[in-house]
Amino acid sequence: MVFSMWTRKRQILIFLNMLLVSRVFGFRWFPKTLPCEVKVNIPEAHVIVDCTDKHLTEIPEGIPTNTTNLTLTINHIPSISPDSFRRLNHLEEIDLRCNCVPVLLGSKANVCTKRLQIRPGSFSGLSDLKALYLDGNQLLEIPQDLPSSLHLLSLEANNIFSITKENLTELVNIETLYLGQNCYYRNPCNVSYSIEKDAFLVMRNLKVLSLKDNNVTAVPTTLPPNLLELYLYNNIIKKIQENDFNNLNELQVLDLSGNCPRCYNVPYPCTPCENNSPLQIHDNAFNSLTELKVLRLHSNSLQHVPPTWFKNMRNLQELDLSQNYLAREIEEAKFLHFLPNLVELDFSFNYELQVYHASITLPHSLSSLENLKILRVKGYVFKELKNSSLSVLHKLPRLEVLDLGTNFIKIADLNIFKHFENLKLIDLSVNKISPSEESREVGFCPNAQTSVDRHGPQVLEALHYFRYDEYARSCRFKNKEPPSFLPLNADCHIYGQTLDLSRNNIFFIKPSDFQHLSFLKCLNLSGNTIGQTLNGSELWPLRELRYLDFSNNRLDLLYSTAFEELQSLEVLDLSSNSHYFQAEGITHMLNFTKKLRLLDKLMMNDNDISTSASRTMESDSLRILEFRGNHLDVLWRAGDNRYLDFFKNLFNLEVLDISRNSLNSLPPEVFEGMPPNLKNLSLAKNGLKSFFWDRLQLLKHLEILDLSHNQLTKVPERLANCSKSLTTLILKHNQIRQLTKYFLEDALQLRYLDISSNKIQVIQKTSFPENVLNNLEMLVLHHNRFLCNCDAVWFVWWVNHTDVTIPYLATDVTCVGPGAHKGQSVISLDLYTCELDLTNLILFSVSISSVLFLMVVMTTSHLFFWDMWYIYYFWKAKIKGYQHLQSMESCYDAFIVYDTKNSAVTEWVLQELVAKLEDPREKHFNLCLEERDWLPGQPVLENLSQSIQLSKKTVFVMTQKYAKTESFKMAFYLSHQRLLDEKVDVIILIFLEKPLQKSKFLQLRKRLCRSSVLEWPANPQAHPYFWQCLKNALTTDNHVAYSQMFKETV
């Protein structure tokens, strides 16, 4: 434990150092050409590489070697081999889902016919691998040679039809195994799904096993005793035997749903058991499940629930009995007495066919469930909801959610909920509740009698219950087996106690309906037909209401006092109330917001508002206004100045969304009428063809401007001259062809720029100053029409070196031309294919001239060298006269020149070379050494010159490194000078390393005088021959050893 904690801390430090170094030195630790997103999760010490849906046909190069999580889902990778992850030794999770999805499950536009091939040992070298997802690849068998570190293996939606002991023997350390969806109607196997007896017994560490959607006919025998979760739903199991779960004492989750299903009205192929018989469960089948917490028996055609099933389930917390035939059983439910710790209970969609109950009868046994928090009874189908129906729930102090949706309730006295102030959600959605003036004492009641069969299909709206596999994992998300669903409008629910009356037949509301519901914080009335004229009195009992969803109704805003009774209201949704706004001659007062002192957010989307009796909206508190899908083009029509200040008196407004208002152009005067504190302005999807950029100066606090999905063709000359506060500019999906010369000059505050999906061909350097670009956090460029010519070289260079995040850089920022570069990624262009400026042209001309000059000189030298040489020296002698060169008498046989700083070379010279050549027992040579024979205090150059002059030969002991030093070059030049002055060749070269193959001098030297170029042999047996060659070279004049061809030429 201590070691693992230390390792984790060390990994975090490594990540921090890696990020710090990349920032300081300005380089990336993965290539820009990598077509994946790379993220670092420092607390978890994870490097996450996501290559989802990148059209890959192989695992890309450049994946960081320290990657821990690699996602390659939704691609077309045909095969995996041991080399696929060769350098990725730190991988902990690999997600290879959906690279060859089965035909009926996959896209019809790209049918995969060749299954993913996984070669043996492909994953065996990944010693840290913990999770492997291989779903949706048409695999025929479980991969072999998996690493022992693997804890999770997912093989869903493949073609694995047979489970045997043999193919599970390597999975002894697996804790989670998903084998579902390998044999069902959307992935048919056409054979019987077989599981060998006791096949899973070898997997002693197995905790989660899923065999869902497989046409399994019986519970597998002898499952591992440590199993915690078992999913067997949507199979064809007809019987649960007494001993099926005998040894599963630790099991916590059991799902047997969809075995012998109730098939009435389901939207998928469904085959019930014979005569609609239920799943037969032995009375003692669950006796061993003492630790069970979740039991799902959804859609098992159950008609009776014996109490004996639950006699040992004292810890059960969630029980799902939905979509069975338990309408009568629900009235008694004696089995609930055995479940004192139950937290969630679902009785939904147990209605009897052709039966419409007068009211609902809940069992008295419910009162024993003191810990119950969630009760769902959708689809019971009854007419009236009254106090006596719910009286049994008064004794449940912890009850938080009561779901009575989709019950065709016609009469509902909402005031019965005054006894349930602890409820957080009361769901009466998708019913037939409607008001009646004649029955005020009841509250809501019917306006017509309707048969239940006529509306039966409405049950399908509850998709949670009528999906074949509600827990199925998609290709994009690997999370599965989620907890129970949340309310549809989660935004409303978070404010507190919620009453959901959405999608009913309510067309009139009055205070008495909510008289005792003052505790409500959120009220959802969306999807009704409320068309009354609100005057500010209808909802006065709801003094604490903070969220009101009034969308999808027929709101008539005749009075400016509408909703004024809701003084605590913070969020108001009036979207999709276009009925009266589309009619002619109706008065609309949109200044009702003035009296809502705490209103923070107002949604008035998709109302087709084109007229208003009030010239302005007013509010001191409103911060967010959504006004999408209206007709500001009519209110701001040219020549009509009445509504130019329509939003001006929203003094606290920060976010204004006026997208989809058909604004082909925006009147310049509108900017003067904008709210003074506006920070976020959205004008998307308006069809704007022009925009008065200079008017942005009037919006002093504007930070975000969204002009996406319009028809703009131009950007401002200088964005900084238009706005000093703008940090985010979104211009995607327009018709912009070019950026102005100084577009971003001085726009240092900009952090996010999106110019994707335009028609930009060239980005000039002056348009994107580097100091501005380096301040950006996000630059979105994909789907433009870049011309990758010489004008783009600077941009390509910047893109390759910047740390700014550019989404889809490797895949979608591509060239449309010239032809050779069409479709090529911008970052992969060769920066050296273009001449940048006149300087390069001049340099090119000079270099060509130099080459031509050298060619002429060399040719002339080759043909007329000796003639020119003779003429030159003849006339030189004529003019200066002849002088005899004085030469000093030699004191040494050889001067040894070597790298005195290299200890290995020094050792070789002193112990090998000196020892051999100055050995008195053999022919004795007098050598001159720098460290031994030079005069102390005398200048180095003078010592060097004297040593060369006083020696018959100069021996250079060569290494690759020493050949590049200045001391070598100086000694060599002085030795070579003797050849020019005295016509004496004194140079001998000894190479201790492999000689420079490309050296022209060395090649020429070998041609002229091969005996003066020696190599120290690696074979010790060749050493005597080397010493003999060296002694011969020291005693022989180099001129004598010159090549015969050279002598004849001379």
UniProtKB/Swiss-Prot annotation:
<keyword id="KW-0812">Transmembrane</keyword>
<dbReference type="GO" id="GO:0032728">
    <property type="term" value="P:positive regulation of interferon-beta production"/>
</dbReference>
<dbReference type="GO" id="GO:0007249">
    <property type="term" value="P:canonical NF-kappaB signal transduction"/>
</dbReference>
<feature type="glycosylation site" description="N-linked (GlcNAc...) asparagine">
    <location>
        <position position="535"/>
    </location>
</feature>
<dbReference type="Pfam" id="PF00560">
    <property type="entry name" value="LRR_1"/>
</dbReference>
<dbReference type="GO" id="GO:0034158">
    <property type="term" value="P:toll-like receptor 8 signaling pathway"/>
</dbReference>
<feature type="repeat" description="LRR 3">
    <location>
        <begin position="89"/>
        <end position="111"/>
    </location>
</feature>
<keyword id="KW-0399">Innate immunity</keyword>
<feature type="glycosylation site" description="N-linked (GlcNAc...) asparagine">
    <location>
        <position position="167"/>
    </location>
</feature>
<dbReference type="GO" id="GO:0005764">
    <property type="term" value="C:lysosome"/>
</dbReference>
<feature type="repeat" description="LRR 19">
    <location>
        <begin position="543"/>
        <end position="565"/>
    </location>
</feature>
<feature type="repeat" description="LRR 27">
    <location>
        <begin position="747"/>
        <end position="770"/>
    </location>
</feature>
<dbReference type="InterPro" id="IPR000483">
    <property type="entry name" value="Cys-rich_flank_reg_C"/>
</dbReference>
<dbReference type="GO" id="GO:0035197">
    <property type="term" value="F:siRNA binding"/>
</dbReference>
<feature type="repeat" description="LRR 16">
    <location>
        <begin position="421"/>
        <end position="443"/>
    </location>
</feature>
<dbReference type="GO" id="GO:0032729">
    <property type="term" value="P:positive regulation of type II interferon production"/>
</dbReference>
<keyword id="KW-0391">Immunity</keyword>
<dbReference type="Pfam" id="PF18837">
    <property type="entry name" value="LRR_12"/>
</dbReference>
<feature type="repeat" description="LRR 25">
    <location>
        <begin position="699"/>
        <end position="722"/>
    </location>
</feature>
<comment type="function">
    <text>Endosomal receptor that plays a key role in innate and adaptive immunity. Controls host immune response against pathogens through recognition of uridine-containing single strand RNAs (ssRNAs) of viral origin or guanosine analogs. Upon binding to agonists, undergoes dimerization that brings TIR domains from the two molecules into direct contact, leading to the recruitment of TIR-containing downstream adapter MYD88 through homotypic interaction.</text>
</comment>
<dbReference type="GO" id="GO:0071260">
    <property type="term" value="P:cellular response to mechanical stimulus"/>
</dbReference>
<dbReference type="Pfam" id="PF13855">
    <property type="entry name" value="LRR_8"/>
</dbReference>
<feature type="repeat" description="LRR 15">
    <location>
        <begin position="396"/>
        <end position="419"/>
    </location>
</feature>
<feature type="repeat" description="LRR 6">
    <location>
        <begin position="171"/>
        <end position="195"/>
    </location>
</feature>
<feature type="glycosylation site" description="N-linked (GlcNAc...) asparagine">
    <location>
        <position position="524"/>
    </location>
</feature>
<dbReference type="GO" id="GO:0003725">
    <property type="term" value="F:double-stranded RNA binding"/>
</dbReference>
<keyword id="KW-0256">Endoplasmic reticulum</keyword>
<keyword id="KW-0967">Endosome</keyword>
<dbReference type="InterPro" id="IPR000157">
    <property type="entry name" value="TIR_dom"/>
</dbReference>
<feature type="repeat" description="LRR 1">
    <location>
        <begin position="42"/>
        <end position="64"/>
    </location>
</feature>
<feature type="topological domain" description="Cytoplasmic">
    <location>
        <begin position="859"/>
        <end position="1050"/>
    </location>
</feature>
<feature type="glycosylation site" description="N-linked (GlcNAc...) asparagine">
    <location>
        <position position="721"/>
    </location>
</feature>
<comment type="similarity">
    <text>Belongs to the Toll-like receptor family.</text>
</comment>
<feature type="glycosylation site" description="N-linked (GlcNAc...) asparagine">
    <location>
        <position position="591"/>
    </location>
</feature>
<dbReference type="GO" id="GO:0051607">
    <property type="term" value="P:defense response to virus"/>
</dbReference>
<feature type="domain" description="TIR">
    <location>
        <begin position="890"/>
        <end position="1034"/>
    </location>
</feature>
<dbReference type="InterPro" id="IPR041283">
    <property type="entry name" value="LRR_12"/>
</dbReference>
<feature type="glycosylation site" description="N-linked (GlcNAc...) asparagine">
    <location>
        <position position="69"/>
    </location>
</feature>
<feature type="repeat" description="LRR 28">
    <location>
        <begin position="773"/>
        <end position="796"/>
    </location>
</feature>
<feature type="glycosylation site" description="N-linked (GlcNAc...) asparagine">
    <location>
        <position position="215"/>
    </location>
</feature>
<feature type="repeat" description="LRR 14">
    <location>
        <begin position="369"/>
        <end position="392"/>
    </location>
</feature>
<keyword id="KW-0458">Lysosome</keyword>
